[in-house]
């Protein structure tokens, strides 16, 4: 993507999403968490890193997730999100450029209230280094694939759910809900109507 087009895309995202400091509030009584939908350019396209959680973890074992985690006492959601990205995939604190936040999502199975932030990781993008005590690895998924409705499959399982297969992993559950919630504004920023 040409530098001017990339800058315009990022600027539109800032206008479309909630401000980082004014995204709303967590669900009362839930465990608070924050994740980051990190956009970076690789080979002329936008990509997003996801983490594959270890199978022996208590919460969401073996699942693919956006980097993020719990918000500590006295910590803002954005500060928690940046800390977790640094811990989980090795992106230095202060490297992310915040673009905004999506609407919080509640996961009743684990009682997490999650705010998804959108951020840009400018070049040069460092190699992602995952935290082995929590994660099995890092997946890099092209934004175009995440926004392609035909790439998402509806399961035939009685518990019907949507998923995206990528590198022998599935993006589903809470992470699918987060991506689906962010997708309309991401699409709008990529292909804006006149005047947007």
Feature names for model-found ranges:
Residues 1-65, 69-124, 144, 152, ...:
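N-terminal leader/linker segments that precede catalytic domains of diphosphate-processing enzymes
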């Amino acid at each position: 993507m040409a530098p001017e087009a990339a800058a315009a895309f990022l600027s539109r995202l800032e206008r479309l999403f909630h401000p980082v400091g004014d995204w709303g509030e967590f669900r009362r009584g839930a465990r608070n968490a924050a994740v980051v939908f990190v956009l970076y350019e690789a080979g002329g396209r936008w990509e997003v890193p996801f983490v594959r959680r270890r199978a022996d973890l208590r919460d969401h074992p073996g699942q693919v997730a956006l980097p993020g985690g719990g918000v500590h006492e006295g910590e803002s959601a954005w500060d928690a999100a940046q800390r977790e990205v640094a811990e989980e995939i090795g992106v230095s604190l202060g490297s992310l450029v915040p673009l905004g936040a999506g609407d919080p999502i509640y996961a009743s199975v684990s009682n997490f209230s999650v705010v998804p932030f959108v951020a840009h990781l400018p070049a040069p993008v460092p190699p992602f280094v995952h935290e082995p005590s929590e994660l099995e690895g890092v997946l890099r998924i092209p934004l175009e694939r995440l926004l392609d409705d035909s790439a998402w499959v509806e399961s035939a399982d009685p518990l019907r759910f949507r998923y995206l297969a990528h590198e022998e992993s599935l993006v589903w559950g809470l992470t699918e809900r987060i991506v689906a919630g962010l997708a309309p504004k991401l699409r709008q920023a990529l292909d804006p109507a006149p005047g947007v």
